[in-house]
Amino acid sequence: LADKKGATEFLGYTSLTSEAIVADILVEGKAVGSAKAGDEVIICVNQTPFYAESGGQVGDTGVMRWADASAVITNTTKTAGLFLHHARIDNGTLVPGQAVSLDVNGSRREALKAHHSATHLLHEALRQVLGDHVAQKGSLVTDTRLRFDFSHPKAMTNKEIAAVEAIVNDRIRMNSQVLTKIMTP
């Protein structure tokens, strides 16, 4: 699909809403000509404010609307530059070429952003307390929690845990401006 339709333009660093055009609708990996109420589908659009699952962070959720119809976006993933909106059609019929309005669940996005930033603060605090050998080995960032997997040769002591917690809390209280920087592996 990416070769035929081109990559999806991501607008989500500056907006939680956008207009878009449906490029394709997929059911079980195959393109279909339409989707109706009750269908579970993947919708590809030309541009989106929905952040796709990446680097341990879950994808955005929200709503897609058109005419007098809507779909609930239950997850967003990405492959080969295409953002895939996993959705359930609530009512109406959706067809490729349809103009739609996209609306990200803003309160959930804010919680995801906070936990994403917290992973960076936690990593730096761990390196300060335990040493430069600490490396991130994985993570899970959701709207309700984060998990941070890291390398260290032994269990942390209560004193080390308290020191890491104090550093992270001090940084949070600083309420520093957050800058978006796209990092490549």
Task: Mark where each language-model region is.
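A glycine- and charged-residue-rich anion-binding loop/surface
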Residues: 1-185
